[in-house]
C-alpha cells in the first residue's frame, strides 16, 4: 500500500476507533518498541528481556479438574477465563521479578467437543457457511484487560494469532469451519487463509474496552506474531500475512512465528521485524549452541528472539539462558529468551499448575525452594532474574520488593481460610482477633501457598485450631505476606462465626462374617468424618479376648486377621478424631481348618493387605 493511502486509512481508523479517542486513557509507556536493524529499542535505549513464558494470561487450562472425558482426544482440558485480579497479580509478579516483556499463547478456536466440556474460546465459527469467524466478546474483554494491565504495570506483550497445533484449537479447527484441511491454512488461495486474515483484522482494529484505545494504538503490544510454531510457513504465506499485519498495525512489530528453523525468506521480507525459534529436545535444538547458530543464520538482518525453551534441568536451562544473554555474532545479540512456562496465583488461593509429559511442572513466582524442589523452581526463577539483570547492564538481580497485602477471601468456616497470595510473597502469617480492630494474635506462621498440584476442592491454606474456638462466637482474621525484603501491610479483615460443632466419625462395618482357620478373614471398615478438630483420624482394630486373634495391620481400615483356634470372635473397629470417636463390632465365626494354612496370612494369594480406607467430608 502506498504511504499516503496508508496514512489516510490509519487516520480513519483512529477517528472511528475508540469513539472517542478523546476518551482513551493515556498509556503508561512513552514509546512503541521499535526495530533498529537487529536490535529492539525503547526510544533510544536498547530493549532486551528474559522471563518465564506465561501462556495463560488470557485463558486458563485448569489442570486441577483433570481431563474432560467428553473429549475423545484424551488430553482435552477444562478451561476458564482469568479474573481481573488474577491478571493484575500475575503481571505484577513478572514485573517485580524483572520481566520487561512477555509472550502469551494463541487465540483459542472453537471446536466440536467444546460444548460437552463447557469450554469457551476466543474465535467462534461463522454464522453463515462462507462467512468470517467471529470474536467472542466475553473472551476479548479478558484480552482487553490483559493488555490494559500490561500497560499499567510496564510489561510489553508478544501476541500470536493462530496455533499450528490443536491444543487450544488451531489451524485445523479454523479450516474445519470451511470443510478444508489443516494444511490449507498455509495456502493463500484457501478459505481458511482468508478467514485467518480476517481474524487478524478484527483483532488489531478492536477497541479496548478498558483503555478506550484501538489495539493498534496500544504501546503495550510490542509485536504481533503470525502464530505459534507455524512450522510449515512458506514465503507467500508469510509475505501476505506480514504485510496485512503492518497494514493495520504500522507502529507495532511483526514476528515470523515459525519453528525449528530460520526462514531465509523472512530475512528479506520488509514487513517482518523479528524471527523466532523455540528450543525443545524433540526438535534437537535444546542447547546453548543453537543461539549462535541461529544468529549466524539471521546475519543481523532481523531481530532474533528465543520465544520458548525449556523442560530441562536448571543447569542446562542456565547454560542456554546465558548463551542468550552473551552470544554475539557480528555485533548482533538475541533480543530475549523465555523459559516454558509460568502459572500464577488462583483467585481464591493456591496456584494454578501444569505438568508436562516430561514430568516438569510449571513455575510459580517468586519461586518456592521447598514446594518446588523436585522442579528446581527456585534455581530456575533465580537464573531468569539474573539474566534479566545482566541484559539491563547489572551484575546481579535486584532484591525483591516487599510484598503487597494479600487478598483474604470471604468464608463461612474458620477451618477453610484462603487468600490470593501477594505477587512476590513467599510465606504468610495469619492473625485472629475477637473484634475487627484487634488485638491480634498470630495463629498461623510461615504458611506457604506454593504447593504444586493445588486442588481447591480438597485443599485450604489455613485451618484454625478447633480447640481454641468457642462455638457460636464470631472471629476476625487478617493475613500478612512475607519475603526476604520484608513484610506486607495486613490484608483486608474478614469475620467468621464459628458454627460447626464437631461430630464423631461415622463408621460402616459388616455385622457378621464367617471363615475357617486356614482362610483367615478380610476385614474392611469405612468411615466418614467432618474434618474436625483436624483432618487426622486414627483408626484401629482390637479384640478384647485371649490373644487368639492376630491382625496384619491393626491400624488400618482394611486388613486381614487370622485365628489360632475355632470359635466366635468380636472384632471392634474404632475411628478417633482426637476429641470424639466411634466404634462398631463385627462378629466373626471361625470354623476348623479345611486345608493347609498359608505361610503368611498377610500375603494371602500374593496380595498385601492393610490399605487404609476412609473419607473426610469437610463441611
Language model segments and positions:
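Substrate-binding cleft of secreted/luminal carbohydrate-active enzymes
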Residues: 305-391
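Extracellular acidic, Ser/Thr/Pro-rich low-complexity tracts
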Residues: 421-426, 483, 526-532, 545, ...
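Pro/Thr/Ser/Gly-rich low-complexity, intrinsically disordered linker/stalk tracts
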Residues: 390-424, 471, 489-501
Amino acid at each position: 500500500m502506498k504511504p499516503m493511502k496508508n496514512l489516510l486509512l490509519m487516520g480513519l481508523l483512529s477517528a472511528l476507533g475508540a469513539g472517542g479517542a478523546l476518551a482513551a486513557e493515556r498509556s503508561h509507556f512513552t514509546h512503541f518498541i521499535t526495530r533498529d536493524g537487529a536490535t529492539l529499542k525503547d526510544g533510544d535505549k536498547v530493549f532486551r528481556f528474559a522471563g518465564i513464558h506465561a501462556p495463560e494470561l488470557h485463558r486458563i487450562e485448569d489442570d486441577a479438574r483433570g481431563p474432560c472425558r467428553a473429549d475423545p482426544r484424551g488430553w482435552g482440558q477444562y478451561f476458564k477465563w482469568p479474573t481481573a485480579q488474577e491478571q493484575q497479580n500475575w503481571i505484577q509478579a513478572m514485573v517485580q521479578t524483572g520481566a520487561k516483556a512477555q509472550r502469551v499463547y494463541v487465540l483459542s478456536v472453537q471446536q466440536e467437543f467444546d460444548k460437552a466440556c463447557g469450554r469457551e474460546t476466543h474465535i467462534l465459527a461463522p454464522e453463515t457457511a462462507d462467512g468470517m469467524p467471529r470474536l467472542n466478546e466475553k473472551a476479548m474483554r479478558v484480552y482487553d484487560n490483559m493488555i490494559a494491565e500490561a500497560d499499567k504495570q510496564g510489561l510489553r506483550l508478544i501476541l500470536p494469532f493462530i496455533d499450528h497445533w490443536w491444543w487450544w484449537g488451531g489451524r485445523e479447527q479454523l479450516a474445519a469451519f470451511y470443510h478444508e484441511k489443516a494444511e490449507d491454512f498455509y495456502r493463500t488461495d484457501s478459505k481458511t487463509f482468508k478467514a485467518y486474515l480476517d481474524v487478524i483484522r478484527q483483532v488489531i482494529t478492536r477497541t479496548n474496552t478498558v483503555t478506550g484505545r484501538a489495539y493498534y494504538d496500544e504501546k503495550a503490544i510490542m509485536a504481533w506474531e503470525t502464530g505459534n510454531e507455524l512450522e510449515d510457513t512458506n514465503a507467500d504465506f508469510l509475505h501476505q500475512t506480514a504485510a496485512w499485519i503492518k497494514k493495520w498495525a504500522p507502529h507495532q512489530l511483526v514476528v515470523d512465528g515459525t519453528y525449528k528453523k530460520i526462514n531465509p525468506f523472512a530475512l528479506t521480507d520488509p514487513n517482518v521485524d523479528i524471527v523466532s525459534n523455540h528450543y525443545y529436545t524433540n526438535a534437537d535444538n535444546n542447547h546453548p549452541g543453537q543461539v549462535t547458530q541461529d544468529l549466524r543464520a539471521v546475519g543481523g538482518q532481523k531481530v532474533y528472539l528465543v520465544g520458548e525453551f525449556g523442560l530441562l534441568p536448571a543447569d542446562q536451562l542456565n547454560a542456554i539462558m546465558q548463551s542468550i544473554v552473551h552470544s554475539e555474532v557480528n555485533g548482533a545479540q538475541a533480543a530475549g529468551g523465555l523459559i516454558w512456562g509460568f502459572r500464577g496465583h488462583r483467585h481464591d488461593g493456591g496456584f494454578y499448575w501444569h505438568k508436562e509429559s516430561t514430568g516438569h511442572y510449571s513455575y510459580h513466582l517468586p519461586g518456592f525452594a521447598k514446594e518446588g524442589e523436585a522442579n528446581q523452581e527456585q534455581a530456575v526463577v533465580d537464573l531468569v532474574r539474573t539474566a534479566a539483570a545482566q541484559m539491563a547492564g547489572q551484575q546481579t538481580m535486584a532484591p525483591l520488593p516487599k510484598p503487597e497485602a494479600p487478598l483474604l477471601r470471604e468464608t463461612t468456616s474458620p477451618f477453610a481460610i484462603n487468600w490470593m497470595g501477594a505477587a512476590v510473597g513467599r510465606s504468610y502469617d495469619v492473625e485472629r482477633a475477637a473484634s475487627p480492630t484487634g488485638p491480634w494474635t498470630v495463629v498461623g506462621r510461615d504458611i506457604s501457598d506454593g504447593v504444586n498440584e493445588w486442588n481447591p476442592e480438597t485443599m485450604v491454606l489455613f485451618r484454625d485450631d478447633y480447640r481454641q474456638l468457642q462455638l457460636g462466637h464470631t472471629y476476625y482474621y487478617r493475613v500478612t505476606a512475607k519475603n526476604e525484603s520484608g513484610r506486607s501491610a495486613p490484608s483486608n479483615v474478614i469475620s467468621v462465626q464459628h458454627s460447626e460443632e464437631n461430630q464423631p466419625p461415622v463408621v460402616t462395618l459388616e455385622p457378621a462374617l464367617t471363615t475357617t482357620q486356614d482362610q483367615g478373614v478380610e476385614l474392611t471398615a469405612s468411615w466418614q468424618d467432618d474434618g474436625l478438630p483436624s483432618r487426622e483420624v486414627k483408626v484401629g482394630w482390637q479384640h478384647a479376648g485371649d490373644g487368639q486373634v492376630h491382625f496384619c495391620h491393626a491400624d488400618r481400615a482394611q486388613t486381614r486377621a487370622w485365628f489360632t483356634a475355632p470359635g466366635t470372635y468380636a472384632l471392634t473397629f474404632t475411628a478417633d478424631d482426637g476429641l470424639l470417636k466411634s466404634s462398631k463390632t463385627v462378629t466373626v465365626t471361625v470354623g476348623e481348618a479345611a486345608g493347609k494354612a498359608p505361610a503368611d496370612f498377610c500375603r494371602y494369594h500374593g496380595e498385601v493387605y492393610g490399605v487404609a480406607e476412609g473419607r473426610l467430608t469437610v463441611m
